[in-house]
């Protein structure tokens, strides 16, 4: 090689090395700049770091364990040791508490537990006063335990006080009972303990002059002489310890009674100008014969005025003047007369006379005594007790049948109301001239008399007639027939098939459909007797029975003349307008009633069972069910064969096959179905009706769903 070639080669090498050095230098500078950027980012983020010198533990340096392979001639032993090293041991559950790990844990998982402690510290923070004795912040300190126990004790102080009060209330020691805090409790707790005089006075509100020996109550007088007639003792029972205004009034009333009895004998104490009680009889009692007492029981009632709503009149034979006595008895007085003759017989009902009065004022005037009392019942405005109301017999009610809803639907139109009566009072007085058999009292019933309502069964029929047929409201009270016009001059469209209401034409124009299409709706109600009513009986105008004298007339317009016939059954020939030049008699075809078919012979219950068996949509009314079944019968099978079908699938298959054939004949509907164009069920129904096939929408919907035909409601 020439020297020039060597120089050129050396220059090339120098250039290559320079470029390499320059690229390495640029890479070094880029790495340094990147490291500086990372350090700046770390320094900026270090301000957000949560540092805790107390609880933070230094992360130990991971130790690298190197295995030293030992040469061994025995290959089986070496393979066994290698297999043992690959077996992993199950890890134990480690605690998040550092103190627990130091005592019971190992040092192998120190790095993981340290990161867990750091996360818990940064997440939950630190509780003040809980770092004593180098414990974790998650442990509860002694101060916290003391505060919790103190709070629990303070919250239970109120409960303890309440518990003590309840125990004291139920226990009631004897020393507290002796202080007079509960006299009734004391008496029931210790029956042998006798109550003092002051306790008796405060309990019964007794006068101190009528109490002696702390346990016995008697009247003032010499008790040593049994033959001496002592004055009656007045006792007032009160349930309240504190004397109220009502008890003060009672004391005044008792004083008035004591003042009157000092001047008037005991027999005249309750005498009134109208009535004097009969001589009282008492059984033989030697100890009680000498004593005459009056017991007055009064309640704390503020008002003793008589109530005008409850008044009973007592009329005597001797004096017909009534005496008004309030039924709200507030004072009861019982008189025992020891001066009368002693009778060994059993006392009768009238041996003790009880008189009701609303005031303690007693008149001392005597009146003649009647021999026997009679019962008089006085009407009152106050309604009787609900217990005494007799339930009305539901059979004796008026029932109304409406063909629009169902022939079986009923509605009660009249209800009997019981009469309000006042209660009956039984009184009996002793009669010396009568025998013992006459004293027997026959019980009289206090039940109110209920007026029975005659049983009626009414039937209502709604008809649609031509507007040219003028009808007025008509009522026949004798035969219980009512005719009422509901609507007049209602325009309707000409139906293509059977109408729900019966139409009565009045001329050939209306029959042919060339006249006016407006109609009138009338309602006829008549009484149905038990002998001519059945559940399957159809209701129409021709079942209304009329009287010959009853007519409906209107001089201003053509009117139907109802009545003037010999029989009670209204025939279609009777429904004709007033003779006019323009009117035409009704054709003979209207007079003939159609013969009942096989479906018409079935009852509504049987037809409803057929609907349920074949899976058809249930409808209300027998006429509607017959119409649906006749449309299906005209479409697939005769009526007798249709009724013989006993399977739902068989009926549906027959209907679906017939529908397939009919739709294929009409190319327009068939092409729309083949092109998956959504069709409306109403359009399919109208197409079938144009061919005199009448099926319900639910049957068509079932056919479309089973055949995969797309339908729409738009």
UniProtKB/Swiss-Prot annotation:
Coiled coil residues, start to end: none
Entry GO MF terms: 5'-flap endonuclease activity
GO terms for biological process, alphabetical: DNA recombination; DNA repair; DNA replication
Subcellular location(s) of the protein: Nucleus
A GO-annotated cellular component: Slx1-Slx4 complex
Bias (Polar residues): 36-46
Signal peptide: none
Region (Disordered): 1-114, 338-369
InterPro entries: Slx4_ascomycetes, Structure-sp_endonuc_su_Slx4
Top-level lineage group: Eukaryota
Ranges annotated as biased composition (Basic residues): 79-92
Keywords on record: DNA damage, DNA recombination, DNA repair, Nucleus, Phosphoprotein
PTM text: Phosphorylated in response to DNA damage.
Biased composition (Basic and acidic residues): 1-14, 24-34
Oligomeric form and interacting partners: Forms a heterodimer with SLX1.
Sequence similarity: Belongs to the SLX4 family.
Role according to the record: Regulatory subunit of the SLX1-SLX4 structure-specific endonuclease that resolves DNA secondary structures generated during DNA repair and recombination. Has endonuclease activity towards branched DNA substrates, introducing single-strand cuts in duplex DNA close to junctions with ss-DNA.
Protein name, UniProt field: Structure-specific endonuclease subunit SLX4 2
Organism: Candida tropicalis (strain ATCC MYA-3404 / T1) (Yeast)
Record gene name: SLX4-2
